[in-house]
């Protein structure tokens, strides 16, 4: 870790600006170069199509006006440099850049953005609980779920039962691509009303006659059989507040805080005491200290500091469980033991054994790989259940069973039920068969862990039926592989792409042959030379993900990567992916996992951490658990930088 702390300074830059005094910092020099040299080029030649009213390819240069802005978009500049040097941008109908301007852009990119820099944690930012985090936090706080009626749940393909997720608006993905990246999503008055409704619903259920066990746990006492909530005593109310408050705040609370909450309850009895108790509990649940993460940590304006153990417990629990810290984490935070590296490793191991760790696959995995797209694509509930749950169970297996990271691509273990059994050829005979009730055509059947033997065309996430169904054509499949698995940045395609022309009269061209003609445009070819070999490698699978068995009629699935590596079919491509492309796949896995864990878009200052973790995982054929341990012990996870002026 010490190597991550060594400082690497920017080189002086494109030009030596003679009027600068020699004592000016490299950082100031870099800022002057961008603002005085590169920014005018962007404004003159790029902003017309990539800024203000028109934003092509999701690239907005109007928001990049300083070196700091440029640093925050570090992934963008490789593509920008590529298209400029290949004469693909500016487009033909715009004045081209001069040779001198191209040299300036290239030199600036190489010297300013490729120079190693110091590893730093992210800026301290409180984050609102996402919808799933809020639901899980309520559940672990009270011991029960708030659910909608069964009839309402059955109206959706997902069968969503959670009242929380039904009522709260869906969180949009943040800049990181994940919905837990909520810093820029404030709480509106309408959403606050919904939180109030949910708080009332939870409290009414807590004090209902059927919830005695949860109430007894909070009171820390056994209640008489004929006890009624209106008969609550002062001692019982105090026990509830003392138990509830630190669990809701996610850190142990001082006696002063507890006494202030208890003051309005004193001298009250019976129904009045119950009403006052509910009011105080609701106030806690509507407090920013409950709805946001990180508000209670001590602040040190202008400093880089380790986060306290309670913040570390929150980061750990919402990363691995999407839920509040349990009693074990709270106790370790209180004793100051949690920040020790060996303790964190032990807790990762413990937490991955908990059923709560399924959230890593259901939330992180689904968002990373775009699996939720199946919700819109497959409307039939039985098929949806099979195609969507199979990759989730596979990811859960990788994450929780200490499996190598690269098994994401190649694994003999899968999960099957009758809904996907038909995709596995002769291996189907070894699968468990479930009898269905008479009169019912199809029904959901349970999944089982299964070892592949003869279905060699399966194995790993890429060839799962749901993934192939979700990406039905070679361009979709190639784009998904590049973006989600290899982590290659691709701009959005132009809006005015002409349709693929049919075969000329007298020629029976395949789709691939017709597409070769279609993509002859130079600006398209740059991306398609990366996309097409990967996408067409999967042409032996039809639009539903079924493997084509007729060897005499198989389409051409061969290809050549930009690296020069050739393959005849996906089986050969898979071998390339797990060997020469392994580091790239591991690096993207590290990048996506760290971004999810930190609930933010990564910056240039995270790259040394990604480099180090990737190196360790590749060298040791590391597992997903190794990756998680590396992340929770990393600089970005354990530390933060406080701004000079802190809001809130």
Q: What are these regions, as identified by a protein language model?
A:
Residues 15-26:
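Hydrophobic h-region of N-terminal signal peptides that target proteins for export
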Residues 228-280:
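A conserved hydrophobic secondary-structure block that centers on an alpha-helix together
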Residues 231-236, 269-279, 302-312, 352-360, ...:
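Structural motif
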Residues 108, 133, 141-142, 183-214, ...:
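Extended surface/linker regions that mediate inter-domain or inter-protein docking
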Residues 257, 261, 288-293, 312, ...:
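Extended, hydrophobic alpha-helical segments in both membrane/secreted and soluble proteins
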Residues 28-79, 86-88, 93-97, 421, ...:
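Sequence context surrounding c-type heme c attachment/ligation sites in exported
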Residues 25-222, 247, 251-254, 258-263, ...:
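Aromatic- and Gly/Pro-enriched helix-to-coil junctions and flexible linker segments
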Residues 2-14:
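Bacterial N-terminal signal peptides that target proteins for export
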């Amino acid at each position: 870790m010490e190597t991550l702390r060594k400082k690497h300074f920017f080189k002086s830059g494109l030009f030596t600006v003679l009027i600068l005094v020699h004592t000016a910092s490299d950082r100031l020099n870099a800022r002057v170069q961008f603002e005085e040299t590169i920014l005018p080029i962007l404004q003159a030649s790029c902003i017309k199509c990539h800024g203000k009213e028109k934003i092509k390819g999701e690239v907005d240069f109007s928001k990049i006006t300083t070196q700091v802005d440029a640093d925050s978009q570090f992934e963008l500049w490789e593509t920008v440099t590529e298209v400029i040097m290949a004469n693909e941008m500016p487009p033909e109908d715009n004045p081209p850049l001069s040779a001198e301007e191209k040299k300036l852009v290239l030199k600036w990119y190489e010297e300013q953005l490729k120079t190693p820099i110091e590893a730093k944690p992210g800026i301290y930012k409180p984050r609102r609980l996402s919808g799933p985090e809020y639901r899980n936090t309520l559940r672990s706080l009270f011991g029960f779920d708030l659910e909608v009626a069964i009839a309402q749940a059955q109206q959706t393909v997902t069968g969503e039962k959670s009242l929380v997720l039904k009522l709260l608006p869906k969180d949009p993905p943040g800049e990181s691509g994940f919905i837990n990246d909520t810093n820029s999503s404030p709480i509106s008055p309408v959403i606050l009303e919904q939180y109030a409704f949910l708080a009332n619903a939870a409290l009414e259920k807590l004090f209902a006659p059927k919830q005695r066990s949860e109430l007894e746990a909070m009171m820390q006492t056994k209640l008489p059989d004929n006890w009624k909530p209106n008969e609550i005593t002062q001692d019982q109310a105090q026990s509830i507040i003392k138990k509830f408050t630190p669990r809701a705040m996610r850190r142990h609370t001082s006696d002063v805080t507890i006494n202030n909450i208890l003051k309005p309850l004193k001298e009250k009895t019976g129904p009045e005491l119950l009403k006052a108790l509910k009011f105080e509990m609701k106030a806690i649940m509507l407090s920013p200290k409950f709805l946001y993460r990180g508000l209670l940590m001590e602040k040190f304006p202008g400093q880089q500091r380790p986060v306290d153990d309670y913040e570390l417990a929150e980061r750990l629990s919402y990363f691995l469980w999407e839920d509040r810290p349990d009693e074990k984490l709270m106790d370790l935070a209180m004793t100051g033991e949690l920040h020790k590296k060996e303790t964190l490793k032990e807790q990762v191991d413990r937490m991955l054994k908990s059923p709560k760790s399924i959230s890593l696959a259901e939330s992180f995995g689904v968002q990373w790989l775009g699996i939720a797209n199946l919700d819109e694509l497959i409307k039939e509930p039985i098929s949806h259940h099979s195609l969507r749950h199979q990759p989730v169970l596979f990811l859960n297996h990788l994450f929780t069973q200490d499996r190598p990271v690269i098994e994401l691509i190649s694994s003999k273990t899968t999960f099957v039920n009758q809904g996907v059994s038909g995709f596995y050829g002769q291996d189907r005979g070894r699968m468990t068969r479930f009898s269905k009730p008479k009169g019912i055509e199809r029904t959901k059947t349970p999944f089982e862990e299964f070892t592949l033997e003869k279905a060699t065309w399966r194995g790993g996430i890429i060839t799962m039926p749901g993934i192939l169904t979700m990406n039905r054509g070679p361009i979709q499949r190639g784009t998904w592989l590049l973006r989600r698995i290899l982590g290659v940045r691709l701009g959005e395609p132009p809006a005015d792409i002409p349709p693929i022309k049919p075969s000329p009269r007298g020629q029976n061209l395949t789709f691939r042959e017709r597409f070769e003609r279609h993509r002859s445009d130079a600006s398209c070819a740059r991306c398609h030379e990366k996309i097409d070999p990967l996408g067409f490698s999967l042409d032996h699978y039809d639009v539903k993900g079924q493997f084509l068995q007729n060897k005499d009629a198989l389409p051409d699935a061969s290809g050549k990567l930009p690296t020069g590596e050739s393959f005849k079919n996906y089986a050969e491509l898979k071998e390339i992916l797990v060997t020469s492309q392994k580091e790239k796949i591991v690096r993207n896995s590290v990048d996506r996992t760290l971004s999810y864990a930190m609930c933010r878009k990564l910056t240039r200052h995270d790259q040394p951490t990604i480099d180090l973790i990737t190196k360790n995982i590749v060298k040791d054929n590391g597992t997903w658990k190794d990756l998680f341990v590396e992340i929770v012990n990393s600089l970005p996870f354990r530390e933060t930088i406080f701004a000079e002026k802190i809001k809130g």
